[in-house]
Every structure is written in structure tokens, then in C-alpha cells.
Amino acid sequence: MQSRLLLLGAPGGHGGPASRRMRLLLRQVVQRRPGGDRQRPEVRLLHAGSGADTGDTVNIGDVSYKLKIPKNPELVPQNYISDSLAQSVVQHLRWIMQKDLLGQDVFLIGPPGPLRRSIAMQYLELTKREVEYIALSRDTTETDLKQRREIRAGTAFYIDQCAVRAATEGRTLILEGLEKAERNVLPVLNNLLENREMQLEDGRFLMSAERYDKLLRDHTKKELDSWKIVRVSENFRVIALGLPVPRYSGNPLDPPLRSRFQARDIYYLPFKDQLKLLYSIGANVSAEKVSQLLSFATTLCSQESSTLGLPDFPLDSLAAAVQILDSFPMMPIKHAIQWLYPYSILLGHEGKMAVEGVLKRFELQDSGSSLLPKEIVKVEKMMENHVSQASVTIRIADKEVTIKVPAGTRLLSQPCASDRFIQTLSHKQLQAEMMQSHMVKDICLIGGKGCGKTVIAKNFADTLGYNIEPIMLYQDMTARDLLQQRYTLPNGDTAWRSSPLVNAALEGKLVLLDGIHRVNAGTLAVLQRLIHDRELSLYDGSRLLREDRYMRLKEELQLSDEQLQKRSIFPIHPSFRIIALAEPPVIGSTAHQWLGPEFLTMFFFHYMKPLVKSEEIQVIKEKVPNVPQEALDKLLSFTHKLRETQDPTAQSLAASLSTRQLLRISRRLSQYPNENLHSAVTKACLSRFLPSLARSALEKNLADATIEINTDDNLEPELKDYKCEVTSGTLRIGAVSAPIYNAHEKMKVPDVLFYDNIQHVIVMEDMLKDFLLGEHLLLVGNQGVGKNKIVDRFLHLLNRPREYIQLHRDTTVQTLTLQPSVKDGLIVYEDSPLVKAVKLGHILVVDEADKAPTNVTCILKTLVENGEMILADGRRIVANSANVNGRENVVVIHPDFRMIVLANRPGFPFLGNDFFGTLGDIFSCHAVDNPKPHSELEMLRQYGPNVPEPILQKLVAAFGELRSLADQGIINYPYSTREVVNIVKHLQKFPTEGLSSVVRNVFDFDSYNNDMREILINTLHKYGIPIGAKPTSVQLAKELTLPEQTFMGYWTIGQARSGMQKLLCPVETHHIDIKGPALINIQEYPIERHEERSLNFTEECASWRIPLDEINIICDIATSHENEQNTLYVVTCNPASLYFMNMTGKSGFFVDFFDIFPRTANGVWHPFVTVAPLGSPLKGQVVLHEQQSNVILLLDTTGRALHRLILPSEKFTSKKPFWWNKEEAETYKMCKEFSHKNWLVFYKEKGNSLTVLDVLEGRTHTISLPINLKTVFLVAEDKWLLVESKTNQKYLLTKPAHIESEGSGVCQLYVLKEEPPSTGFGVTQETEFSIPHKISSDQLSSEHLSSAVEQKIASPNRILSDEKNYATIVVGFPDLMSPSEVYSWKRPSSLHKRSGTDTSFYRGKKKRGTPKQSNCVTLLDTNQVVRILPPGEVPLKDIYPKDVTPPQTSGYIEVTDLQSKKLRYIPIPRSESLSPYTTWLSTISDTDALLAEWDKSGVVTVDMGGHIRLWETGLERLQRSLMEWRNMIGQDDRNMQITINRDSGEDVSSPKHGKEDPDNMPHVGGNTWAGGTGGRDTAGLGGKGGPYRLDAGHTVYQVSQAEKDAVPEEVKRAAREMGQRAFQQRLKEIQMSEYDAATYERFSGAVRRQVHSLRIILDNLQAKGKERQWLRHQATGELDDAKIIDGLTGEKAIYKRRGELEPQLGSPQQKPKRLRLVVDVSGSMYRFNRMDGRLERTMEAVCMVMEAFENYEEKFQYDIVGHSGDGYNIGLVPMNKIPKDNKQRLEILKTMHAHSQFCMSGDHTLEGTEHAIKEIVKEEADEYFVIVLSDANLSRYGIHPAKFAQILTRDPQVNAFAIFIGSLGDQATRLQRTLPAGRSFVAMDTKDIPQILQQIFTSTMLSSV
């Protein structure tokens, strides 16, 4: 209905100033309108007769309202009505007036923005009504609405709050933000709204006016007052303002509440009205631009755009934007739009495209960057009616524009004056833009963390002369914290203290709201009115008004400032401005979308782009002038490469390399120029604790940026450098020194038991460097690595007092800073350690920082960064004392104050919060790791000085391995030094306890987790900690008795038959011809050494493998013993190569000689290489000799040089035999008995000369002989035993000690005769000469000799062994010329005789001669001869009992012990693989193992599969080892006293299931109930003899061990059968055959461990997601510190308790994560499965996914598809049909197998990946994962890897990973290089596939939950 506006002024009316203003106002309204337009609604003001109180009437159209004169005119809104009211607003006002006349309450509903509020205020201004305004937030409670208690003079009073005041005084109550209030708070008002009645806390009762007036007729006012009845004014009205909730977030309206309001939709102003308004503002802007701008904005507010998920455009900010454009008409509009609506950081890709489309549609795209503001040119101060302003000149394009902006009270500084601020181009531009916004509105600055927002804001404030008020916001901040807090006055009265924000508003400061993205939107709502209207109502009833409104009020009421302040009305300073700082919203995530439609209306947004590289270099260079240039360039190109990658992993790494962090690194580099950049970066990223994916991505990127680990830093630095020392007031740690602090408070300096070790000293040195640079430190590490100890030691050395504070779950911001407590009714604050440390300059140690919620620890940021912090009692901490000048309540930070924060590493299994992620970049981070083995050993020695060294070494090694398993994620618990130290302390105190029982103190935690237990036991066994062994499990070889010795006769020297005494042999001397050196590559490989005595004690004490090719053949081994180091050399001959290793070390080395030994021309060439290690001074050099080609090589293993030595005899060797000559190839031999003395002897078989090679002198001596040689034994240095080839006649060659070059020394050859004992008649029995296999080159000691031949004797002797005798001793040989006696222990039958027949069939031809290796050693120190025999030569019947089948072996070690006259046969386990060349093998040795001496009392064997084993054979040594071993196990079987074991004495009958108890009561013992605990025979937990475990959920009572052991066998068997039956039953239920069950078990069992650990992590996630929160304002629970005062006043709801937090209002449903596994089921998988089992591994991986995610469907939804030649989308597991049991899972595995068997060939990896990525995003989910398994031979199908890389990263929402199953050659690794880091894996070994999957899950999926 159209109405007319009339203006009728009664002449001479005295309506007072108010009515005069109203008339003027209405007159203006009318004058603006063109006359004669009669279709408009009108507002009229009518006067009644002169002087009447309620004289004036307001008419809006046909609705009129009588004005009343307000009692408190200062409460009437001022200055809200604008000159020209838009038609739509007039319509709204008319409607409100109608409702007002009806006495109804109204609800103005509509989109966010100030419009609804301003309409309400305009109405109230028009009708002269007093207003009570309350902004509801989630912190509003009943007391804020009704009555609050205050204490006055020791008595609690009730003070009426807004609703009650409004009702009694007849004001209008405006409730803003109903959707913000928590549920069930507002119903308090229901009755007041409906019946105008309310019961108050103080006993009064509000009653509606009509009823009150009725009562008043019958009763007097006095009576009613005595009944405490109060009249509600008939003028009381409520206006509620709210958002429509389904569209915006918030709590929906309560139906009873809703029904009490009349609603009116207040949408944005209509297009025309809005356009008119904008035209009036922006006179300089072309009309076309304005209308385009408005059209754009209106489009984005339409229904369609909200269905796209775009937030509403803030239409209300348009006026401000047009105001800027009015001053800068040349500025592109698109640019201004970005400020109002920062769509580029707010929206995902699709949203951006939509907005860009609308921009194009309205031709707003033309943003020439040349028209953007460039910089601020100058700033001048000016005063305009007492308001300080600045005129700022901004250069835009090439014009300069001057604008007026509000300024602060301090002096202005020119834009580039600050020395701490470095101007870069983008920053200048940003400042200019901020200046433009500052002209009209508050600013919100958005930028990543550490990019300099605070610095920019501060510089901006300096430029305009503002004082800054930084306010750090945190997550659980309440509205009270923002506005006013309660405190007590000294007399005990309660009062309100204004917050810094309110003070700043009054004083005209610039407020920095730091971290506005953290605060709950419901809390920020209280600031809306301050930001939009510059008005604020506080809790204590005071009101802050905008300055012009305040002035108007002052002038109208003719009051002074003091009088207004008495009425608690204050002006807001016109210069007051807010700058909010925030981190960009997380695009696409539901949880972190703080930038909503409501927020958009409050600020102008400026995005602070990360610095570009050149600018960042400029900043760093100017801040740190002498930073090394090269390092800086590398660092920045690396960082920017990370920042530009889309990959989330790279992004998170880049986040920890913020500008702030780069500056820190640069400062350190400039201070310590030889620092290593690699370690600086890894330290900043804390790479030690990154998930494995992120770590590998970081390593890859570092390698690409050529940032290497310094190789010249030797891994173990010089030990002498690293120590801490204090000299004359200076502390030196390593290379860094610092002055020692002079502490006042000595008792606060920590003093701690600390044993220095190198690694901790290095950490402390590193800390000291940063400490001296003024950094605050953050130490991150696993538990028990000594973080606290290091810090205490560090402070002790520096002599700094420390304050200690430990955080935990319930730490709040208040408890961090102050502890409030009540004393005598006053509230008193006690300083927390933090404040004390700040005041006194102590070091604050914050322990367990990751346990507190991150929203609490955030407040440390401003303290560390800016040195500012506000305390709960109103004091503030400031950094520089210059700012203090006379302000009270200020604490200045002491210059010596520092913070050291300790936290556990982020991520599983530590259930802390990610402290490092949120605050890592403001501290200097140090990763503290467990000490390296030798540091740890050093430390443990000090903890356990009496603990035997080997035990410490074992512990260190075993724990080292466990830690590396924890790093790989195979086990969850990271074992730390703390655990080892505890073990060592125990052993130190109780030395008799066995190690294996003491380690259980640590490992019993894991005893119920079978997978974990298995890993632990294996690891401990590997290092020889015999956990689980019993003292009785000793399994030494059985001893057989040696036959009696027999006297064999004499060896006599000389007296040749011909009568010749001796033969002389001439000698020639030559120099060696040396070729070379050639540098040779020596590869290192790790040794996995297993201590073998884990479960039982045997002769074998350790073993390890060398990485041998399957076809390779070991042909010789040798050991060298140099100063305590035993080195083992192993030579192989196909191809020729050498392995050598220190027998105690961690790594071995490998040299390949394939291309060095010459291949001879004849077809079949079987090289045979022997090795001789040389001794000191040629330590580390070895001589290698090939027997057929007689090539001699000298290899220097330390210098990596190879020489070839050419002997003179070689120069004229006979013609080479070709394959058609059937003659035998020649064989050359090397005698190496004295190689440790650096000389060797070479001879040719059947040759007649010997060549002595003296390596040290570089000479050879050739001795010519009159005989042809068969073998040579060097029995002493100067006496050699020779055997002639045809007759086996022995000779003794003596040579002078040193053959001189003159040739004077001549060698003499004697015949050696073996004479049998004389039979008395001169008849000698003929003996066949046997060739010894081995003759010792030294003699037995005389005790050994005496006990061997059983007569006291001292004489030279040699011990030898041959095929007929176990051992032979020759007494007197070789030094005495008299006949030597020969004693033998004869074998029952000769060796090698039997083997001739039975091997001839399966080894091909008959054996040619004897094998080349005799495998025989003499151990003189233990009086033993040791050799290896094939099983056929061993008396197995004597060793093993009848019914035992002998094990498969590589051979037996035969130990002939002449001391105890015993024989032992020790089996060598058979080798895992054998070379297929069996004939070749048989020429080398007749067993599959070779033997050498290990040390004085043991031997080493190497089998043909490359397995090296160390054996102890000496009896004394074995006895000693057995003692140690028994000590390690401890005496578990000692009987303890005071134990009373009550045996129940009952027998066990047959097992049964037992009765099920209907009430499920716990049953203990008895013999009846099923599911009981601890009974016998019935199924249950922990009983004896029960059939299977049945858990009814009660505590378990254990039957004592002895009783368990007493269960008879047949009962056990029955129990097992019953268990079997239950299993059968389960199979039957899911219809699975046993064969199927076994098949499934094959796949499932292989991944059980991974499934298990994944499920543990998933469970923890579930738990973490379900973590309870603190619920405030509770009536029961723990006292909430923030509400102590409310408690004093006697309020009820002052407690807090833990509870499930309601999901935040309007926050969307948590969606599950989506995973799609794309597996390769192509034909090649089936085809190559035989080679590497890839198909089975893939099936295992699928099985793992299905099992791990079972029952987590609401968190993770997965489906599995396959790709093959048949297609790219073969459904295996659809999302809605997840397999439920093993049978269904097996079906899926079978399908995979069958598919790959029968599908077409071809490859659809790319299509499959692309399709999966496209499809998966179609459904909404929290996160998307696509994992592709493929054996893609990409090049074969012509697919370019770059194409694949592009597909993997095509959608930033999807985390896509590819796992390639190792294909041919290095193809897979090449592929990985082209694919993005951390996104692709190569599983060369298919066993890794499940492992890799597990890695992906743990490091990505779980990181973000």
C-alpha cells in the first residue's frame, strides 16, 4: 500500500530540540524528492498542542506512533538515520512500527552485514526509544541476560542486566546474533517474551503491566513492593537480529522461541536503491563502472552462487570500496573486488573459475597491473578539529594522489625510514594499498606464517604515528577476554577491567588482532558492532559511541564529558583502527574455513604474497649483510622450488622454511661460515622426525639443489675437540665459547648427574651457537633421549638459573601466565614461572610442550617474536623499556630471558599435539636423537662401571637396531637411552641377575603383542641376548674318545741311499717387475651379524652373510690378525672377486676383479684364486694369486690401489695349452704360511724351482732344485718340507736366514726318511708314503706336548694331519738333526678312499685328483687339529641316537683335541644356495664349506652360499663363554623362599565348553562356567588345560605355572582338538573349506604385521578424534580459573568439565576419507610372478588394505579396481560391497589371480590412474587418495614418464601415489626420478609393497586426521 510523506509543522510549537531536529531531518528528506511523485510512502511528524509531553507523532504512511520523551535520552540511538532513506528501508520501518503498535516482538532475519542492525537503530532513533543492546555469542550465559552478582562492601548484590533493565524501564532490547548463542540459553527469555513475566534470582518477580495494574486496583504499591513484584513497562519491546541458519552456520532457532517472534526478511537493499547510494558516494567514478561493480556483487549474492558454495559477497562494504575508487578513479575495479572478496585465496579451483567468469561477464577483467598503487611517496601530519590526521601521497600508475587518513598520536615517520624494515617492491605496494583501505575501513592482512605480517603492520603503524596494541588471539578465547574481565578491588569489591582492545578504542591506538583465524566465529560476533558502527556495549553497562554520535549527544543534552562519563558513556577515538592478521584459509577443507560470509563484511582483505626469490634475497642480505653468497643462493632456490610444488608434502616442508626460518639460518651461516647448509635445512624441517615419505622427498629435493652433506666432516669427529670445559669464567663447548653467567639465585641453577658423551656435547655446542645468537630453543626428540638432562646440563654449564613449567592437557592460557587464588575474599594473582623468568631474566624451560593444546601454546608466539604479552591481571609484558615511559602495570622483559622448549617428536605413537607444526618456525629447532653407539657405550660405561663390556656392547647394538626399526615404522615404540640406562643400573646393582631377565623389565610391555614380540626376540637374539633361553639349553657336540696313540717310527734326515749327505741348490735374485697402480673401486655393504647363542649354547658364536651371486664360487679364505683386529678375506672365482671385512665390524667390502684377471684362450677356464694377507708395515695389503695363469696381484685395501707383480720365471713360460691339446694345464701354487712376515713362496706343480717373493724389499729369489715338486710346506722360516712328485719322497730344504744378493748363501737339500719302528731283525716293513694335508709352522708348547704324548718332554715339534691319521706329532723335527719320533692317532679307515666310488656317478666324471683345498687347520694354543669332513666320512651312528635322522649339513667340523684326547663332530648348517657348477665345486673342496683359523682358539667357516660362521673350539674358551652365557641368562631356577604355593590338588578331567552364565558374573576357578578366568578344563582365560581362549571380559586370574605344567598330555591333546573344532565351526559359518582357509592364510599371514600396526594407528586416530574437550559454564566439575570471581559473588555455573564437544554449530558433517586402490592385474603380472612373486605380493597388499580398514568404514571408504589389457576400470571391490569375512576376501584375491591369468596383454596404467582420479572426486569426502600399483614397463608401451607425472598431480585435491614393481634394469629408478618426489615408489623387492603401502597410509592419511 503506497503512502505519502507529509510535513506539517505546527507554527510556534515548542517541541524541544529533539522535535526540531526531527522536523529538519524530515524536511531534508522531502526536499530531496522530486515534487508531485505521489506514489511514495511517507514519514510524517505531527505536533499536538504546545507544551504537551508526548506531543509529537511519527507517521510512516498511514501508520502513526506517538513519541514519548525518553527518561535517559543518552540511551537513544543517534545519527543512524541518513539524509535520504531508501524506499525499501522506509517499508521495513513501517512494518516494525505496525508490530510495535501491536506490542509484538520482531525478528529481523537476513544475510550477514550491518543492515539489519542499522534499520532497528533507525527505527528506535525515529521513535526516540532507549535501547539495550546485547551481542550474543557462544559465551553468553543466563547471567548476562538477567542478573549478575557483584560484591559491594562485602555483600553480594544483584545487578540487573540488559533484559531486566529493558523490561522494567520500558526500553527496547536488541538481541543480535541469536544463532550464536549456545542451545538452551535463550529459553530464559521465553516467558518474558510471551507473558512479560520473569522470576529473578534476587527473589523479585517481573509482572506484565496489565496484571500489575489489575492488582494495583486491589492492593497498594507498598504491598506489591513487599511481595517483590515489579511492573514490566508496557513500552518494553524486543528486536532480535539473526541469520537464517540452514544457509549460514549457527544454531537453528528453538521452535518455542521462534513462535514468539514476528519475522521480517531484510535482504540487501534493492539494486536501484543501492546504485543510487553508490552514485552519491562515488561522484568521480564512471557510472558504468559502478553499475558493473554492483551487478557483479549482486550476482555473487544470488541463490545460484550459494549453491556453488561461494560465500556471499559483502554488499555492505561496497560503499567503502566506491569511496576509495572515488579518490583513485584510475584504479581497476577488479583490484578493489579482491579486497572485498579475496576469492583467489578463499575458493578452490572451481570457485575461482566461477568468479572469473562473472568478472568477464561484466567486463571487469581488464586489470592492467600498471594501474596499481606503487608506493607511498610521503606522509604529512595535519590536525583537523582536534583530530590527528595524515595526508598521504600515493603514487599510482604515474600519478600521485593525496588522501586524508586517520593518524595516531605519535610523530609520523616517513615510509622508508625504519631501519629494521626492508622495503621491497611488493611490500611498498602492499603498504600503499593498505593506506587506501585505511582511509575507509579496518584491514585484515592474510598471509602464511612467518611471511612478515606483523612487521608490515608495525611499519604501517609507525608510518602513521600509531601506538600499537597487539592482541594475541587464541582458540578458546571468550567474549569476556576480548572486552572486559572481572577483578577484585583491594576492598574486596568486584569490578570490571577493560581489555586492551577497549582501551585502545578509547585512546585511538592501532589494534593488531593477531591470529584472527583461530578464534571461534561465535566469539568474534561481539566485535561486529564495534567494527561496523564503532559502538560497543560492555558488561558493566558502559557504552562506547562513535565520536560524531557522542558529540551530537553532548551538544543535544548540553552535558560535559565528566557528566557523560558518570552515565558511563565514552567516545571511541576517531583514529582507532583494527588490523587483523590471519593465515590463509585452507582451501577445500571444511574445518579451517574461518573466512565466512559474516567475516567478509567486517574488513578489507589484503593478501600478503610470499616473497619472490629476488625480494627474499634482498631482505636477507640487508638483514644479514655478511651471509655467504653461494649458500644463500642454494638455500633460496631450494626453498622456492619447494614452495612452487603443488604436492602437499612439499608444501608442508616449505612451511617450515618460512622467511623467518631462512633469516635464522642465514644469521647462523654468517656467524659460523663453515656450517653445513644441509644440516641447517634438515634441522629447520626437523627431518629426523618426518614421516618417511616426506623425508625422502626432502632428501631428493636437497640432492637436486646440490646441497650435500659435507663429506669432510668425518662422521666421528676428533674426540679431543669435543669436551666441555670451564676456564676463567668462560665456558667452551666444542669450538664455541661463551661467558659464564653470574647468577644471583644460585639455587635455581640446575645441577644434574650427567655423563659427557660426544654426541650430547655436539648437541650442546649447536644449542650454544643459537643461544649466543639470541634465539629461543626448541628441542624435539623421542622419549628418554635425554632432552631434560641436556638442557639442565647446558644451563648448569652456563650457570643460568632456570624456571620450569610442565604443560599438560589442561593447561590454559591463564595457567601459563598467572595462577589466580582467593585470599581473604580478594583475588590474588601469583606469577607463573613464565612471568618470573621474564622479570628476573631466568631461562624458562617449557617441558612437554606438545601435550598442551596448540591453541594455548600459541600465546608464546608474541612473547618470543615481539616480546609482548598481556597477563590476566591486566599487566602487560613489553620488550623495550622505551615503550614504558610512565605506564603502570608494565613488566619489562629482562634482556637475559630465554625460553627453551622441549617436545616429543610429532606424529604417532606420541599422542601429543603438533607443537612443531604450529610454532616450530619461531624457535631454533634441535632434533635430539639417541646417542650414536659409541657415545652411548661411553655413557653406559659410566653408569655401569662393573658391567662387563660385551654386555654393554650387546645392549647398545640391539637397541640401535630396534630404534632403526621404529624409524622405519616397523615397530611403534621408539626404544630410548633411558631404557638402556635403567637396564645397566639394574645390572650394576645386581650383577648376578641375568641379562635376559633384566631386559624383560623393558620388553614385558610388549609381551602380549605377538608380532611385536617376535620382532623383539629376533632382534635380541641377533645380538646374542639370550631372552627366552634356559640355563639347561646347552647343545655342544658329543665327545667321542680318540683312539690310543701309536708310535710310528722315526723321521731321519740325510743319509741318501747314494751316500750323498746333502745337495746344494743355487739361488738367483731379481727385482720384481711391478705394473700399475690401477685405482680400483671398493664397494661397502652392511653386515647383518647374528649372535648365534640366543636360544641355546653351541660352539657357533656368530654368523653373517656376504652378498654372493648364485653362480659365484668361493675358492679361498684367509684371516689376518693385526693389533687386536681380525680381518677375514674371502675370494671367489666366478667372477673373480674379493670380499673382506673386520670380523667385529658393521660393514664389509667387496672388490670385483672380473675384468682384471686375464681370461686364457682355452675354452673352459676355471680360475682358482688364493689370497694371502700381508702383515705390518704392509697392513691392509693382500696378495692374490691365480693358479693357472700365475697372475699375482697386490691389492692395497686402504689406498684402493692394485699392482700386478711379475715374477722373472713368468717371462718364459711354456706354450699355453689349447683346448685341443688334451694335456693338463699347468698349476702354480703359493705358500702363504709366512705371509704376515711379508714373504711368500711360489712354485709350479711338477716344476723344479721355488721362487721366494719378498714383498717389502721388492725382490725375488729363485731356488733351482734337482727334483720335481709336488707340494711344499713351510714348516719354519728357514726349513721347508718338500715332497717329490712321482715318489712322494720327502726332502728338507734349509736356507740361510737372509739370502743376500751376492748369492753367498746356498740352500741345502736333505733327504728325509720315514723309518718304521724296527722289528728287531733289520727288516723294515714297507710303508706307503702319505702326503700330509697340513703341517703346523710352529710348535706346541711343552705342556701341550707333554700332555699329548703323555710323557714329560720339552723338544721342538710339529703337528700334522693326513688322510690316515687324526693327528701326528713329530718330536724333534725340524730343528734337531737326530731322528725325530713320530706319534700318531690313527683313523679306523683312511679318508677319501670311500668317496671314490659313491660320488663318481652324480658328480660326472671320476674325480681328477684331490680337491685343491684341504680344509685343515692346526690350533697350537688349544692343542687341536680341526678340519671339515663331508658327512660320508663322519661316524654319524656314534653321534646321533638311532631314531634321529642327521640334519642336512654342508659338512662337519672335526675337532681332534689332543689335550683331552677327545673327538668332536660339529655340524655346519647347509648353505642356502649352491652354485650350479657342481664339478667345478668338487675341484675346490669335497665339502660345501671352507675353513680357516679365526683366532687362537677358534675357526671360521664360509659355506658356498656365502654364509660365514665363527666357531669356538678351544675348551677353555668354551667354558668361559658358557659361564658368561649362563650369567646373562641368570639363575631363573633358584628356589625363592617365602612363596606359599597352594596347589589346588584337583585332577583335570576332559575339557568342555562349560555352562554359559546367564548373568555373566565373573567366575574364578571352579570347573563349570564358560568364559570364567583361571579355572581348569573349561574354556576361559589363563586356566590350565582349557581348550581355547574365551573372553567374557573379566580380569584374568592366572593358575600358577607349576600347576599349568602339571596338565597331563592327553588333556592337552583334547584341548587342542576342541580348539580345532571351534575353528572348523567358524569355517563352516562362512562356508570356507580348510584348503581355502590355508590359501587365505598364506596371503593374510604375510601381511599380518603391517595390518596390525596400521590398525593400532587407526585405533589411536579414532581415539584422538573422539578426544573430549573442556565444557565451560557447568554447574558441576572443576573450578574454572576464569570464573573465580563469579564464584566469589555466588554464581552457580562456574565449573568446567570434560565432555564430548558438540560439533561446532553449522560445521559440516565429518566426511570419511576416500581411498581408491588401482592394482595391476595385467598378464605380465601373472607371467613374471614366477620370477619375483609380484602378483602374490600385490594380492597381499590388497589383502592388507581389506583387513586393515575393516570396521573403519565410517572413517575410510575404499574401493579397489584393477587395470589390465582388458580395460582400465575393472571393479574388484566396489565401495558399497566391502568384503566382510575371509571367504569374501579370498574370492576377491582369486578374481585378481584369475583375471591376470586370462586377460589380454596391454597396459592401461595411465588410463586407470586418470579415470580413478577423475571418478574419486565426484563424491564428497574429507580427503582423496589414489594408489596405483603397476609393473608398468612404460617405455615398452611408448608412454612418457612426464605424462604419467602430469596425471598423478592433475588434481591437487587428490593425493595420488604410484608404486612400481621393479622392472628391468634401472628403469624403475629412472622413472622415479621424473615423477614428483614422495609420490612414487619403486619396489625392487616385491616384499616391500605392503611396507610401502603402510608408509603411505601412516605418513599422509593419518597426518591430517
From Swiss-Prot:
ATP binds at residues 447-454. Keywords: ATP-binding, Disease variant, Glycoprotein, Mitochondrion, Nucleotide-binding, Peroxisome, Retinitis pigmentosa, Transit peptide. Residues 1542-1563 are annotated as: Disordered. Residues 1543-1560 have a biased composition (Basic and acidic residues). Residues 1-28 form a transit peptide. Residues 1714-1896 form the VWFA domain. It holds the Pfam family AAA_5. In fetal eye, it is highly expressed in the retina while expression is low in the cornea, sclera and lens. GO terms for molecular function: ATP binding; ATP hydrolysis activity. GO terms for cellular component: cytoplasm; mitochondrion; peroxisome. It is linked to Retinitis pigmentosa 97: An autosomal dominant form of retinitis pigmentosa, a retinal dystrophy belonging to the group of pigmentary retinopathies. Retinitis pigmentosa is characterized by retinal pigment deposits visible on fundus examination and primary loss of rod photoreceptor cells followed by secondary loss of cone photoreceptors. Patients typically have night vision blindness and loss of midperipheral visual field. RP97 is characterized by onset of night blindness and visual field defects in the first decade of life. Monomer. Isoform 1 and isoform 2 interact with PEX7. Isoform 2 interacts with isoform 1 of PEX5 in a PEX7-dependent manner. PANTHER family: VON WILLEBRAND FACTOR A DOMAIN-CONTAINING PROTEIN 8. This is von Willebrand factor A domain-containing protein 8. It comes from Homo sapiens (Human). The gene is VWA8.
